[in-house]
Amino acid sequence: MVAIFEFTCSCCGKLHEGSPSFGYKAPMHYEVLSEQDKQSLATLTDDLCEIDSPEGTDYFARVVLELPIHGVEEPFLWGVWVSLSEESFARYTSTWGEHDESDSYFGWFSNRLPYYPDTINLKTNVRPRNGGLRPYLELEPSAHPLATHYFEGLSIQEAQRIAEEVMHGGS
């Protein structure tokens, strides 16, 4: 197994070392709000988000999705957000730092990832972790390419293509 993932970027010519890791500061549902609505309807921290609306409150948690890279020890990491039910959000936040790591919360994927067809509302399970670690995200099986990469892994070439698209846009 290769110790570290590295590639020479076809866009900028730089050598990038270490498995790719990209993250989102907020769920897509927060990002589309006006600045006024962000101030009046939403609460956002590094790990949690709540958005009020006439229909009720939406709850989100920041999680980590790991995609294995064939022949590489460290996975491709996405820091993304998932929506949780009010009950799951309350249970998750009430056990902060003392989670039952065998617990699982159903959630909906809440960011659009580049390279992939629309990832909003992919079915997920959130697995809490202790020790200050963000929860681990499990995707439910589906025909979506992100789910395929989650279960079957990425080739080194695919990981490079995705990283280049995130860093430089377009493919």
Predicted regions and their residues:
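Short, surface-exposed linear patches
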Residues: 30-33, 87, 160-161
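Charged, low-complexity interaction segments
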Residues: 45-128
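C-terminal, charged low-complexity interaction regions
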Residues: 94-171
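Surface-exposed beta-strand edges and their flanking turn/coil or helix-capping segments
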Residues: 31-39, 75-78, 92-95, 151-152
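Basic, glycine-/proline-tolerant helical and adjacent loop/strand elements
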Residues: 1-70
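A general marker of short, structured functional hotspots
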Residues: 9-12, 20, 26, 88, ...
